[in-house]
């Protein structure tokens, strides 16, 4: 029996024993980002679900993906096998456990996957570095503040993002926040008998290469993107770069009120949080999307700002060059008196770098209106579908 089949059977059996026992209550790392948080509570077991993610333009199929936890090294398998919903995306998580079931956080990851665009297999059987385990424990123990509901929330999903070239990221997620905890895990290219990897696909296509070519058609635009752009293996190294900057939003009309509870930031390294979060980021990756609400003259305005990938990469690279890498910057969004002009810039030291190609949507609604509809007040990208605003490697 092949190693692939043994891996699947052993881990699924181990997991099944836990399900029954609880009566359904339930590489080498070069550098990983460490999250510094204070402990609150001493829990070491939590209700969590593992999942896998991959870029929309670079889908993967897993032979197995197992998160190993506990002294008995029990495996928690990811049941879904196809992934292309986006980096750090937790939506593929399938939680079959009862709400009260809790487990220790994972210590090891075993994964085998087929990179469909590369037509290559990658494999990893690696210990999660101790500092990353500590970071996850701190985050799960502390949870996070969700300013919209003014509630304390919990992390409940651990996302393994599989990238071209065998790179892997670990992100922890909850309803209202995502935090990248490790960005430098690495798998190695390997050889697998395609018949063992996917027997049904083997019977239909006979070879992995034919299967991958056909599978590209399952994803909108992926084949065309591959032909036009190829695979930018170093792009995700750019995405994970962090800089010391703050985000400032202000208005020409000083009577305008920013509803900070709804101000959200999404970054290129999968980090996502609200401005009212009580554990704000000091070092941030480049922004991908910023959304916020402001109130003025009896109207509520909702703004969605999607940054241009090429521009935001180049501007941050130039502003935080080797000479200014350690300086603190300010990403400034200024809104005009009539809410229809938007000046965006990155300011580092005495230098200002304009961001002129940001895609902006603004919706308007009268405060107190019972209508569920919002008027499109401003749109500088009318001919662009919102799905097209995703970055290449997202």
Name each region found by the language model.
Residues 1-13:
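N-terminal secretory signal peptides that target proteins for export/translocation
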Residues 39-54, 228-249:
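Contiguous beta-strand segments within globular domains
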Residues 15-25:
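Sec-dependent signal peptide recognition
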Residues 30-31:
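C-terminal motif of bacterial Sec signal peptides marking the signal peptidase cleavage site
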Residues 37-68, 93:
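An N-terminus-focused feature that recognizes amino-terminal "leader" regions
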Residues 136-234, 319-389, 393:
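Compositionally biased low-complexity segments at domain edges in trafficked proteins
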Residues 124-135, 141-146, 304-317:
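Short beta-strand elements
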Residues 67-115, 256-314, 393:
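Tryptophan-paired
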């Amino acid at each position: 029996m092949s190693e692939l089949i043994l891996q699947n059977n052993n881990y699924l059996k181990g997991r099944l024993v836990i399900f029954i026992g609880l009566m359904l209550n339930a590489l080498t790392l070069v550098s990983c980002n460490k999250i510094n948080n204070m402990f609150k509570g001493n829990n070491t077991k939590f209700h969590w679900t593992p999942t896998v993610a991959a870029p929309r333009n670079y889908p993967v199929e897993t032979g197995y993906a197992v998160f190993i936890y506990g002294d008995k090294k029990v495996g928690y398998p990811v049941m879904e096998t196809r992934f292309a919903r986006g980096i750090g995306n937790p939506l593929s998580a399938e939680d079959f456990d009862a709400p009260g079931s809790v487990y220790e956080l994972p210590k090891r990851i075993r994964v085998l996957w087929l990179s469909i665009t590369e037509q290559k297999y990658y494999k990893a059987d690696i210990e999660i570095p101790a500092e990353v385990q500590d970071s996850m424990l701190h985050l799960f123990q502390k949870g996070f503040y969700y300013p919209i509901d003014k509630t304390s929330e919990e992390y409940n999903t651990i996302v393994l993002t599989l990238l071209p070239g065998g790179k892997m990221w670990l992100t922890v997620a909850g309803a209202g926040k995502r935090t990248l905890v490790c960005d430098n895990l690495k798998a190695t290219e390997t050889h697998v008998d395609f018949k063992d990897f996917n027997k049904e696909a083997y019977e239909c296509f006979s070879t992995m290469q034919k299967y991958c070519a056909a599978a590209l058609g399952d994803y909108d635009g992926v084949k065309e993107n591959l032909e036009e752009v190829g695979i930018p293996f170093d792009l995700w190294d750019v995405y994970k770069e962090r800089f010391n900057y703050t985000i400032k939003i202000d208005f020409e009309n000083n009577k305008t009120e920013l509803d900070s509870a709804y101000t959200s930031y999404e970054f290129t390294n999968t980090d996502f949080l609200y401005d009212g979060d009580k554990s704000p980021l000091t070092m941030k990756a480049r922004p991908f999307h910023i959304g916020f609400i402001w109130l003025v003259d009896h109207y509520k305005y909702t703004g969605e700002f999607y940054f241009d990938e090429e521009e935001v990469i180049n501007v941050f690279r130039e502003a935080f060059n080797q000479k200014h890498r350690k300086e603190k910057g300010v990403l400034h969004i200024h809104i005009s008196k009539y809410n229809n002009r938007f000046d965006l810039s990155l300011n580092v030291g005495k230098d200002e770098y304009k961001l002129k190609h940001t895609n902006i949507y603004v919706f308007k609604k009268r405060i107190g209106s019972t209508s569920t509809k919002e008027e499109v007040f401003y749109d500088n990208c009318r001919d662009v579908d919102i799905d097209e605003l995703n970055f290449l490697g997202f």
